[in-house]
Amino acid sequence: MVNVVLGSQWGDEGKGKLVDLLVGKYDIVARCAGGNNAGHTIVVNGVKYDFHMLPSGLVNPNCQNLLGNGVVIHVPSFFKELETLEAKGLKNARSRLFVSSRAHLVFDFHQVTDKLRELELSGRSKDGKNIGTTGKGIGPTYSTKASRSGLRVHHLVNDQPGAWEEFVARYKRLLETRRQRYGDFEYDFEAKPAEYKKLREQLKPFVVDSVVFMHNAIEAKKKILVEGANALMLDIDFGTYPYVTSSNTGIGGVLTGLGIPPRTIDEIYGVVKAYTTRVGEGPFPTEQLNENGEKLQTIGAEFGVTTGRKRRCGWLDLVVLKYSTLINGYTSLNITKLDVLDTFKEIPVGISYSIQGKKLDLFPEDLNILGKVEVEYKVLPGWDQDITKITKYEDLPENAKKYLKYIENFVGVPVEWVGTGPARESMLHKEIK
Protein backbone atom coordinates (compact mmCIF):
# COMPACT_ATOMS: atom_id res chain seq x y z
CA MET A 1 0.00 0.00 0.00
CA VAL A 2 1.38 3.39 -1.05
CA ASN A 3 -0.45 6.56 -0.01
CA VAL A 4 0.72 10.04 -0.94
CA VAL A 5 0.51 13.48 0.72
CA LEU A 6 0.82 16.37 -1.75
CA GLY A 7 0.62 20.15 -1.50
CA SER A 8 -2.12 21.60 -3.67
CA GLN A 9 -1.20 25.30 -3.74
CA TRP A 10 2.17 27.12 -3.54
CA GLY A 11 3.56 25.23 -0.56
CA ASP A 12 3.38 25.80 3.20
CA GLU A 13 -0.03 24.14 3.35
CA GLY A 14 0.82 22.02 6.40
CA LYS A 15 1.73 18.70 4.79
CA GLY A 16 4.06 17.76 7.62
CA LYS A 17 1.29 17.92 10.20
CA LEU A 18 -0.86 15.48 8.24
CA VAL A 19 2.13 13.18 7.76
CA ASP A 20 2.76 13.38 11.50
CA LEU A 21 -0.88 12.49 12.19
CA LEU A 22 -0.78 9.51 9.83
CA VAL A 23 2.74 8.24 10.36
CA GLY A 24 1.85 5.95 13.26
CA LYS A 25 -0.07 3.77 10.79
CA TYR A 26 2.83 3.37 8.36
CA ASP A 27 6.00 1.30 8.19
CA ILE A 28 7.87 3.63 5.84
CA VAL A 29 7.80 7.36 5.02
CA ALA A 30 9.57 8.40 1.81
CA ARG A 31 10.46 11.69 0.17
CA CYS A 32 10.62 11.77 -3.60
CA ALA A 33 11.73 15.27 -4.68
CA GLY A 34 13.28 18.54 -3.60
CA GLY A 35 16.00 19.12 -1.04
CA ASN A 36 16.39 21.35 1.99
CA ASN A 37 14.60 24.20 0.20
CA ALA A 38 11.29 23.48 1.92
CA GLY A 39 10.45 23.35 5.59
CA HIS A 40 7.80 22.58 8.15
CA THR A 41 7.51 22.26 11.90
CA ILE A 42 6.00 19.37 13.83
CA VAL A 43 5.18 19.65 17.53
CA VAL A 44 5.30 16.41 19.54
CA ASN A 45 4.75 16.49 23.31
CA GLY A 46 5.56 20.18 23.35
CA VAL A 47 8.84 19.75 21.43
CA LYS A 48 9.20 21.51 18.08
CA TYR A 49 10.97 19.62 15.32
CA ASP A 50 11.95 21.57 12.19
CA PHE A 51 12.21 19.47 9.05
CA HIS A 52 13.77 20.65 5.81
CA MET A 53 15.27 17.70 3.96
CA LEU A 54 14.58 14.70 6.18
CA PRO A 55 11.25 12.82 6.20
CA SER A 56 8.78 13.65 8.98
CA GLY A 57 8.40 9.94 9.71
CA LEU A 58 11.46 10.22 11.93
CA VAL A 59 9.15 11.38 14.75
CA ASN A 60 7.74 7.83 14.85
CA PRO A 61 10.38 5.58 16.50
CA ASN A 62 9.04 2.53 14.65
CA CYS A 63 9.07 4.02 11.15
CA GLN A 64 11.75 3.70 8.46
CA ASN A 65 12.47 6.77 6.33
CA LEU A 66 13.83 7.11 2.80
CA LEU A 67 15.21 9.97 0.73
CA GLY A 68 14.48 8.79 -2.81
CA ASN A 69 16.42 9.19 -6.03
CA GLY A 70 14.47 12.34 -6.92
CA VAL A 71 15.75 14.18 -3.84
CA VAL A 72 18.90 16.32 -4.07
CA ILE A 73 21.14 16.14 -1.01
CA HIS A 74 23.53 18.66 0.50
CA VAL A 75 25.44 16.23 2.71
CA PRO A 76 26.61 18.74 5.38
CA SER A 77 23.01 19.95 5.78
CA PHE A 78 21.80 16.34 5.94
CA PHE A 79 23.96 15.69 8.99
CA LYS A 80 23.31 19.09 10.56
CA GLU A 81 19.55 18.55 10.40
CA LEU A 82 19.88 15.01 11.71
CA GLU A 83 22.04 16.12 14.65
CA THR A 84 19.63 18.96 15.48
CA LEU A 85 16.72 16.51 15.60
CA GLU A 86 18.71 14.04 17.69
CA ALA A 87 19.60 16.80 20.16
CA LYS A 88 15.86 17.29 20.73
CA GLY A 89 15.43 13.67 21.73
CA LEU A 90 14.58 11.92 18.46
CA LYS A 91 15.21 8.23 19.12
CA ASN A 92 17.20 5.75 16.98
CA ALA A 93 16.95 8.08 13.97
CA ARG A 94 20.15 6.90 12.29
CA SER A 95 19.08 3.28 12.16
CA ARG A 96 15.77 4.28 10.51
CA LEU A 97 17.06 6.67 7.85
CA PHE A 98 18.06 5.63 4.32
CA VAL A 99 19.38 7.54 1.30
CA SER A 100 19.06 6.52 -2.34
CA SER A 101 22.35 5.79 -4.06
CA ARG A 102 20.89 7.50 -7.15
CA ALA A 103 20.12 10.83 -5.44
CA HIS A 104 22.11 13.78 -6.76
CA LEU A 105 24.49 15.77 -4.58
CA VAL A 106 24.22 19.49 -3.84
CA PHE A 107 27.59 21.17 -3.33
CA ASP A 108 28.39 24.53 -1.79
CA PHE A 109 29.26 25.97 -5.20
CA HIS A 110 25.73 25.11 -6.34
CA GLN A 111 24.48 27.38 -3.56
CA VAL A 112 26.88 30.17 -4.53
CA THR A 113 25.85 30.04 -8.18
CA ASP A 114 22.19 29.82 -7.19
CA LYS A 115 22.46 33.29 -5.67
CA LEU A 116 24.57 34.62 -8.54
CA ARG A 117 22.00 33.37 -11.04
CA GLU A 118 19.22 35.05 -9.06
CA LEU A 119 21.04 38.38 -9.18
CA GLU A 120 21.66 37.93 -12.89
CA LEU A 121 18.00 37.22 -13.62
CA SER A 122 16.74 40.14 -11.55
CA GLY A 123 19.12 42.43 -13.42
CA ARG A 124 17.78 41.25 -16.77
CA SER A 125 14.08 41.40 -15.95
CA LYS A 126 12.08 44.49 -16.87
CA ASP A 127 10.56 44.84 -13.42
CA GLY A 128 13.62 43.76 -11.43
CA LYS A 129 11.79 40.75 -10.03
CA ASN A 130 13.50 37.43 -9.46
CA ILE A 131 12.42 33.81 -9.14
CA GLY A 132 12.52 33.91 -5.33
CA THR A 133 14.99 31.07 -4.87
CA THR A 134 15.88 29.92 -1.36
CA GLY A 135 19.56 29.96 -2.35
CA LYS A 136 20.01 26.34 -1.29
CA GLY A 137 21.49 25.27 -4.63
CA ILE A 138 18.51 23.15 -5.61
CA GLY A 139 17.99 24.64 -9.08
CA PRO A 140 21.66 24.44 -10.14
CA THR A 141 21.83 20.83 -8.92
CA TYR A 142 18.79 19.80 -10.96
CA SER A 143 20.37 21.70 -13.86
CA THR A 144 23.56 19.63 -13.70
CA LYS A 145 21.40 16.52 -13.34
CA ALA A 146 19.52 17.38 -16.53
CA SER A 147 22.77 18.13 -18.38
CA ARG A 148 24.14 14.74 -17.24
CA SER A 149 27.16 16.30 -15.54
CA GLY A 150 26.03 15.95 -11.91
CA LEU A 151 27.39 13.71 -9.19
CA ARG A 152 25.25 11.20 -7.34
CA VAL A 153 25.51 9.61 -3.91
CA HIS A 154 27.00 6.39 -5.31
CA HIS A 155 29.85 8.40 -6.86
CA LEU A 156 30.74 9.69 -3.40
CA VAL A 157 30.56 6.43 -1.44
CA ASN A 158 32.09 4.12 -4.09
CA ASP A 159 34.93 2.06 -2.58
CA GLN A 160 36.30 0.66 -5.83
CA PRO A 161 39.98 1.39 -6.68
CA GLY A 162 40.31 4.79 -8.33
CA ALA A 163 36.72 5.77 -7.50
CA TRP A 164 37.69 8.59 -5.13
CA GLU A 165 40.13 10.06 -7.63
CA GLU A 166 37.41 9.96 -10.28
CA PHE A 167 34.99 11.68 -7.90
CA VAL A 168 37.46 14.52 -7.25
CA ALA A 169 38.19 14.91 -10.97
CA ARG A 170 34.48 15.10 -11.84
CA TYR A 171 33.91 17.49 -8.94
CA LYS A 172 36.67 19.75 -10.24
CA ARG A 173 35.28 19.69 -13.79
CA LEU A 174 31.84 20.57 -12.46
CA LEU A 175 33.25 23.48 -10.48
CA GLU A 176 35.24 24.74 -13.47
CA THR A 177 32.14 24.82 -15.67
CA ARG A 178 30.47 27.00 -13.03
CA ARG A 179 33.47 29.33 -12.99
CA GLN A 180 33.46 29.57 -16.77
CA ARG A 181 29.79 30.52 -16.58
CA TYR A 182 29.86 32.96 -13.63
CA GLY A 183 33.48 34.07 -13.39
CA ASP A 184 35.99 33.51 -10.60
CA PHE A 185 33.95 33.44 -7.38
CA GLU A 186 35.36 32.83 -3.91
CA TYR A 187 35.52 29.10 -3.18
CA ASP A 188 38.07 26.95 -1.32
CA PHE A 189 38.49 24.03 -3.71
CA GLU A 190 41.39 22.45 -1.82
CA ALA A 191 39.45 22.12 1.44
CA LYS A 192 36.20 20.74 0.00
CA PRO A 193 37.38 17.31 -1.27
CA ALA A 194 38.98 16.63 2.11
CA GLU A 195 35.71 17.55 3.82
CA TYR A 196 33.76 15.21 1.55
CA LYS A 197 36.24 12.39 2.10
CA LYS A 198 35.25 12.49 5.78
CA LEU A 199 31.57 12.84 4.99
CA ARG A 200 31.58 9.84 2.63
CA GLU A 201 32.48 7.53 5.52
CA GLN A 202 29.68 8.99 7.62
CA LEU A 203 27.18 8.69 4.78
CA LYS A 204 27.91 5.09 3.74
CA PRO A 205 25.74 3.38 6.40
CA PHE A 206 22.66 5.28 5.16
CA VAL A 207 22.99 4.44 1.45
CA VAL A 208 20.69 1.91 -0.23
CA ASP A 209 19.46 1.03 -3.70
CA SER A 210 16.11 2.77 -3.33
CA VAL A 211 14.47 0.84 -6.19
CA VAL A 212 15.20 -2.45 -4.41
CA PHE A 213 14.23 -0.89 -1.06
CA MET A 214 10.83 0.29 -2.32
CA HIS A 215 9.92 -2.80 -4.29
CA ASN A 216 10.90 -5.15 -1.47
CA ALA A 217 8.68 -3.09 0.83
CA ILE A 218 5.77 -3.19 -1.64
CA GLU A 219 6.12 -6.96 -2.12
CA ALA A 220 6.19 -7.40 1.66
CA LYS A 221 2.92 -5.40 1.80
CA LYS A 222 4.47 -2.70 3.95
CA LYS A 223 2.41 0.43 4.50
CA ILE A 224 4.21 3.29 2.77
CA LEU A 225 3.49 7.02 2.99
CA VAL A 226 5.08 9.38 0.46
CA GLU A 227 5.68 12.90 1.73
CA GLY A 228 5.55 15.41 -1.10
CA ALA A 229 7.71 18.54 -1.03
CA ASN A 230 6.65 22.03 -2.10
CA ALA A 231 3.35 21.88 -4.00
CA LEU A 232 1.72 21.50 -7.40
CA MET A 233 1.81 25.22 -8.25
CA LEU A 234 5.60 25.12 -7.85
CA ASP A 235 5.97 22.13 -10.20
CA ILE A 236 8.52 22.67 -12.98
CA ASP A 237 5.95 21.61 -15.62
CA PHE A 238 2.56 22.52 -14.18
CA GLY A 239 3.31 25.42 -11.84
CA THR A 240 3.54 29.16 -12.53
CA TYR A 241 6.69 28.77 -14.61
CA PRO A 242 9.32 30.23 -14.29
CA TYR A 243 8.37 31.11 -10.69
CA VAL A 244 8.64 27.47 -9.66
CA THR A 245 11.05 25.01 -8.13
CA SER A 246 13.22 22.75 -10.30
CA SER A 247 11.53 19.40 -9.79
CA ASN A 248 8.19 17.68 -10.36
CA THR A 249 6.28 18.27 -7.15
CA GLY A 250 3.04 16.59 -8.22
CA ILE A 251 2.04 12.96 -8.55
CA GLY A 252 4.43 12.43 -11.47
CA GLY A 253 7.39 13.23 -9.24
CA VAL A 254 6.32 10.49 -6.83
CA LEU A 255 6.70 7.85 -9.55
CA THR A 256 9.98 9.09 -10.99
CA GLY A 257 11.44 10.11 -7.63
CA LEU A 258 10.99 6.68 -6.07
CA GLY A 259 10.94 4.33 -9.06
CA ILE A 260 7.51 2.86 -8.39
CA PRO A 261 4.72 2.08 -10.90
CA PRO A 262 1.37 3.95 -10.88
CA ARG A 263 -0.62 0.84 -9.96
CA THR A 264 1.03 0.74 -6.51
CA ILE A 265 -0.57 4.04 -5.42
CA ASP A 266 -3.81 3.85 -3.45
CA GLU A 267 -4.79 7.17 -1.84
CA ILE A 268 -3.65 10.68 -2.77
CA TYR A 269 -4.25 13.26 -0.05
CA GLY A 270 -4.29 16.91 -1.14
CA VAL A 271 -3.35 19.41 1.55
CA VAL A 272 -5.08 22.79 1.18
CA LYS A 273 -4.65 25.88 3.32
CA ALA A 274 -8.06 27.45 4.05
CA TYR A 275 -6.74 30.62 2.42
CA THR A 276 -3.79 31.04 0.06
CA THR A 277 -0.16 31.98 0.66
CA ARG A 278 2.90 32.26 -1.50
CA VAL A 279 6.60 32.96 -0.87
CA GLY A 280 8.65 34.82 -3.46
CA GLU A 281 7.65 36.37 -6.75
CA GLY A 282 5.11 35.29 -9.33
CA PRO A 283 1.43 35.89 -10.09
CA PHE A 284 -1.02 35.43 -7.23
CA PRO A 285 -4.57 36.24 -8.43
CA THR A 286 -6.32 36.25 -5.04
CA GLU A 287 -3.55 38.09 -3.15
CA GLN A 288 -4.83 40.74 -0.74
CA LEU A 289 -2.51 43.74 -0.58
CA ASN A 290 -4.64 45.31 2.11
CA GLU A 291 -5.66 44.90 5.74
CA ASN A 292 -7.21 41.49 5.00
CA GLY A 293 -3.88 40.23 3.70
CA GLU A 294 -2.08 41.68 6.71
CA LYS A 295 -4.62 40.11 9.06
CA LEU A 296 -4.16 36.67 7.46
CA GLN A 297 -0.38 37.09 7.67
CA THR A 298 -0.47 38.09 11.35
CA ILE A 299 -3.02 35.57 12.64
CA GLY A 300 -1.57 32.77 10.52
CA ALA A 301 2.04 33.59 11.53
CA GLU A 302 2.97 33.37 7.87
CA PHE A 303 6.75 33.24 7.85
CA GLY A 304 8.75 30.62 5.95
CA VAL A 305 10.42 27.91 8.09
CA THR A 306 13.41 27.69 5.73
CA THR A 307 13.87 31.34 4.70
CA GLY A 308 12.07 33.33 7.40
CA ARG A 309 10.51 35.40 4.62
CA LYS A 310 7.00 36.81 5.00
CA ARG A 311 4.45 34.90 2.99
CA ARG A 312 2.11 36.77 0.69
CA CYS A 313 -1.50 36.14 1.69
CA GLY A 314 -4.86 36.06 -0.03
CA TRP A 315 -8.22 34.32 -0.24
CA LEU A 316 -8.66 30.67 -1.14
CA ASP A 317 -8.38 30.23 -4.91
CA LEU A 318 -10.64 27.41 -6.06
CA VAL A 319 -9.50 27.81 -9.67
CA VAL A 320 -6.03 26.81 -8.50
CA LEU A 321 -7.39 23.96 -6.39
CA LYS A 322 -9.49 22.57 -9.23
CA TYR A 323 -6.50 22.70 -11.59
CA SER A 324 -4.32 21.03 -8.97
CA THR A 325 -6.97 18.33 -8.48
CA LEU A 326 -7.13 17.58 -12.21
CA ILE A 327 -3.40 16.86 -12.29
CA ASN A 328 -2.86 15.11 -8.95
CA GLY A 329 -6.16 13.24 -8.71
CA TYR A 330 -6.75 13.74 -4.99
CA THR A 331 -8.92 11.14 -3.32
CA SER A 332 -9.54 13.37 -0.28
CA LEU A 333 -8.51 16.75 1.09
CA ASN A 334 -7.00 18.09 4.29
CA ILE A 335 -8.09 21.72 4.85
CA THR A 336 -5.57 23.35 7.19
CA LYS A 337 -5.56 26.50 9.34
CA LEU A 338 -9.31 26.96 9.20
CA ASP A 339 -9.06 28.70 12.57
CA VAL A 340 -7.19 31.62 10.97
CA LEU A 341 -10.53 32.63 9.42
CA ASP A 342 -12.39 32.63 12.76
CA THR A 343 -12.76 36.41 13.06
CA PHE A 344 -13.66 37.26 9.45
CA LYS A 345 -17.31 38.32 9.07
CA GLU A 346 -17.28 37.40 5.38
CA ILE A 347 -14.90 35.08 3.54
CA PRO A 348 -14.54 35.43 -0.24
CA VAL A 349 -13.24 32.50 -2.30
CA GLY A 350 -12.06 32.82 -5.90
CA ILE A 351 -14.24 30.77 -8.25
CA SER A 352 -13.33 31.92 -11.78
CA TYR A 353 -10.96 34.09 -13.81
CA SER A 354 -11.77 36.41 -16.67
CA ILE A 355 -9.69 38.68 -18.85
CA GLN A 356 -11.17 41.61 -20.74
CA GLY A 357 -14.62 40.33 -19.83
CA LYS A 358 -14.04 36.83 -21.21
CA LYS A 359 -14.18 33.97 -18.71
CA LEU A 360 -11.28 31.51 -18.83
CA ASP A 361 -12.03 27.80 -18.89
CA LEU A 362 -9.08 26.79 -16.71
CA PHE A 363 -5.93 28.02 -15.02
CA PRO A 364 -3.82 29.72 -17.75
CA GLU A 365 -0.27 28.62 -18.53
CA ASP A 366 0.74 32.09 -19.76
CA LEU A 367 1.83 34.34 -16.89
CA ASN A 368 1.13 37.44 -18.97
CA ILE A 369 -2.51 36.36 -18.92
CA LEU A 370 -2.47 35.15 -15.31
CA GLY A 371 -1.06 38.45 -14.12
CA LYS A 372 -3.98 40.34 -15.65
CA VAL A 373 -6.95 38.17 -14.73
CA GLU A 374 -9.93 39.48 -12.82
CA VAL A 375 -11.12 37.11 -10.12
CA GLU A 376 -14.78 36.38 -9.53
CA TYR A 377 -15.45 35.74 -5.86
CA LYS A 378 -18.17 33.88 -4.01
CA VAL A 379 -18.59 35.56 -0.63
CA LEU A 380 -19.37 33.07 2.12
CA PRO A 381 -20.48 34.01 5.66
CA GLY A 382 -17.93 33.74 8.45
CA TRP A 383 -18.60 32.02 11.77
CA ASP A 384 -17.09 34.55 14.20
CA GLN A 385 -16.26 31.83 16.72
CA ASP A 386 -13.10 30.32 18.18
CA ILE A 387 -12.86 26.79 16.78
CA THR A 388 -9.47 25.87 18.26
CA LYS A 389 -11.01 23.93 21.17
CA ILE A 390 -13.40 21.89 19.02
CA THR A 391 -12.55 18.18 18.91
CA LYS A 392 -15.21 16.80 16.55
CA TYR A 393 -16.05 17.78 13.00
CA GLU A 394 -19.76 17.68 13.82
CA ASP A 395 -19.26 20.43 16.43
CA LEU A 396 -17.88 22.98 13.98
CA PRO A 397 -20.06 26.08 13.46
CA GLU A 398 -22.58 25.65 10.66
CA ASN A 399 -20.96 28.35 8.55
CA ALA A 400 -17.57 26.65 8.89
CA LYS A 401 -19.10 23.40 7.67
CA LYS A 402 -20.77 25.27 4.81
CA TYR A 403 -17.38 26.72 3.85
CA LEU A 404 -15.89 23.23 3.73
CA LYS A 405 -18.88 21.85 1.85
CA TYR A 406 -18.57 24.58 -0.76
CA ILE A 407 -14.96 23.54 -1.36
CA GLU A 408 -15.97 19.87 -1.65
CA ASN A 409 -18.72 20.61 -4.15
CA PHE A 410 -16.57 22.92 -6.25
CA VAL A 411 -13.65 20.53 -6.77
CA GLY A 412 -15.55 17.26 -6.41
CA VAL A 413 -13.29 15.82 -3.72
CA PRO A 414 -14.34 15.10 -0.11
CA VAL A 415 -12.72 16.86 2.84
CA GLU A 416 -11.38 14.23 5.24
CA TRP A 417 -9.35 16.30 7.72
CA VAL A 418 -9.69 19.85 9.03
CA GLY A 419 -6.92 21.71 10.85
CA THR A 420 -8.19 23.94 13.66
CA GLY A 421 -4.97 25.05 15.35
CA PRO A 422 -1.19 24.57 15.52
CA ALA A 423 -1.20 21.73 18.07
CA ARG A 424 -0.70 18.15 16.94
CA GLU A 425 -4.15 17.14 18.16
CA SER A 426 -5.87 20.09 16.45
CA MET A 427 -6.93 18.05 13.44
CA LEU A 428 -10.53 16.93 13.03
CA HIS A 429 -11.32 13.81 11.04
CA LYS A 430 -14.48 13.44 8.98
CA GLU A 431 -15.61 10.03 7.82
CA ILE A 432 -15.97 9.87 4.06
CA LYS A 433 -17.90 7.34 2.04
UniProtKB/Swiss-Prot annotation:
The protein's annotated pathway: Purine metabolism; AMP biosynthesis via de novo pathway; AMP from IMP: step 1/2
Swiss-Prot/TrEMBL cofactor(s): Mg(2+)
EC assignment: 6.3.4.4
The organism's place on the tree of life at top rank: Eukaryota
PROSITE patterns, per database record: ADENYLOSUCCIN_SYN_1, ADENYLOSUCCIN_SYN_2
Pfam families registered for this protein in UniProt: Adenylsucc_synt
Binding-site positions, substrate: V305, T306, T307, G308, R309, K310, R311
Chain residues that bind Mg(2+): D12, G39
Binding site for IMP: D12, E13, G14, K15, N37, A38, G39, H40, T134, R148, N230, T245, R309
Catalytic activity from the UniProt record: IMP + L-aspartate + GTP = N(6)-(1,2-dicarboxyethyl)-AMP + GDP + phosphate + 2 H(+)
Subcellular location: Cytoplasm
SUPFAM superfamilies: P-loop containing nucleoside triphosphate hydrolases
Active site feature: D12, H40
Cofactor: binding details: Binds 1 Mg(2+) ion per subunit.
Key words, A-Z: Cytoplasm, GTP-binding, Ligase, Magnesium, Metal-binding, Nucleotide-binding, Purine biosynthesis
Role, per record: Plays an important role in the de novo pathway and in the salvage pathway of purine nucleotide biosynthesis. Catalyzes the first committed step in the biosynthesis of AMP from IMP.
NCBIfam families per UniProt: PRK01117.1, purA
PANTHER family for the chain: ADENYLOSUCCINATE SYNTHETASE
Assembly and oligomerization: Homodimer.
The protein, known as: Adenylosuccinate synthetase
UniProt organism field: Saccharomyces cerevisiae (strain Lalvin EC1118 / Prise de mousse)
Taxonomy of the source species: Eukaryota, Fungi, Dikarya, Ascomycota, Saccharomycotina
